[in-house]
Amino acid sequence: MLKPPVDAPIDVKDWIDNRPIAAYQWLILVLCFLIVLFDGFDVAVMGFIAPSLMQDWGLSRAAFGPVMSAGMVGLAIGALTAGPYADRLGRKKVLLIAVSGFSLLSLACAFARNPYELAVLRLLTGIALGAAMPNCTTLLAEYLPTRNRSLMITIMFTGFNMGSGLGGFLSAWLIPHHGWKSVLLAGGLLPLALLPLLWWLLPESARFLAARQAPASQIAAALAKLGGRFAAGTRFTVSEPTTQHKAPARQLFSERYRFGTLALWLTYFMGLLVIYLTMGWLPTLLRDGGLSIERAATITGLFQIGGAVGAIVVGWIMDRRNPNRVIAIAYALGGLCIVSLGALSLESSLLVVGVAAAGFCMSGAQTALNAFAPGYYPTEFRATGVSWMLGIGRFGAIFGSLIGGAVLSLGLGLPLLFTLLGLPAFAAALAILANGHARLRATPAVTAP
């Protein structure tokens, strides 16, 4: 069926919102899921190969520390720098460059001759990895109807956990037979094999094309893959704020977005602070409390499993209720679960339930925030908004990794330690509620010629 007359511009967002999900949108989800899966694999890979690598090179934990931290710093740099480029060059171009980058650099890591070379390569790999995830989020969000966006983006993000798990299984199989370098080679070759499919099948965002006032024929061709047929001369629009292509980063701090942007940053920072503190130091807390290493690791693993389930559930609820309140409630419940762990016996079965529930709420809220952010910003600087939130949040992860040891060395009791651990979760809940009070003014639409 042909679309409205040529004198009636078609709003790309409304057009997508008013149609059932097409097979091509599911294909975009699968492709983005695979990118995030390989992203998760590569982010976690150093932890899996560290024991073998340190033994092979005769390194102490202290000497290997810069290699581990270099990748995390790179993730923050990549997230902060990639967004503005994606808002100017396009989501697909930057995404292809990012995947090519972390694939080739992962291969290069396998041939590093010393920890200094490896640290530099992991920094560069982290930059490419940091650029990939926010662009996956933005591209997928711009092709999804609002009614399903949160759920489908959270499904995409479960690929990160699955990629981390895949890294563990592959490492357990490859390292005994082929050594630690084989894991890095696998981490480079697998996404490299995906690149031709991404180049061929992954589209540029139709909303990005409309916001940049690309020729209507390009927009029509992109929407045709979703089943659209348009009369010759049809014009396309995005009914969103327009800034006449001013620097995307500047728009984050404009009067309209400044407060909400800072609230998002605080939310993401605090959420990752809690998650990295928990994942990094909970095994040590449990071990110091008398549990075996195996049981401490198993209980901590339930945090991630609960998080994968929580991400999908929170995303599903977000599509049906006020997203700010849903995320705030999840963070607050996560904080309560973490605080309650300090009152439980380490031998109690309730401890297992409490850790899984904390992961369900905390990781569920954190992943849901990834789905929330694309809807907060307009197309013109959406990639910048999402990527800067992720980049600032990475500093929460770095801070959490750094202060954990110092806090444990204070010799505080478990109840007080878990209370301190839960406090940032309540701060995250308040911050996302504050974001809900940021009001956006209506502005004219942008029409593609």
Swiss-Prot record:
The chain crosses the membrane at residues 26-46, 62-82, 92-112, 123-143, 155-175, 183-203, 262-282, 298-318, 326-346, 349-369, 388-408, 414-434. Its main location: membrane. It is a multi-pass membrane protein. One of its GO terms (molecular function) is carboxylic acid transmembrane transporter activity. Gene3D superfamilies: MFS general substrate transporter like domains (1.20.1250.20). InterPro entries: MFS, MFS_dom, MFS_trans_sf, Sugar_transporter_CS. GO terms for cellular component: plasma membrane. Keywords: Membrane, Sugar transport, Transmembrane, Transmembrane helix, Transport. It is found in: Membrane. Pfam families: MFS_1. PANTHER family: CARBOXYLIC ACID TRANSPORTER PROTEIN HOMOLOG. Transporter that specifically mediates the uptake of gallate. Belongs to the major facilitator superfamily. Sugar transporter (TC 2.A.1.1) family. This is Gallate transporter. It comes from Pseudomonas putida (Arthrobacter siderocapsulatus). The gene is galT.
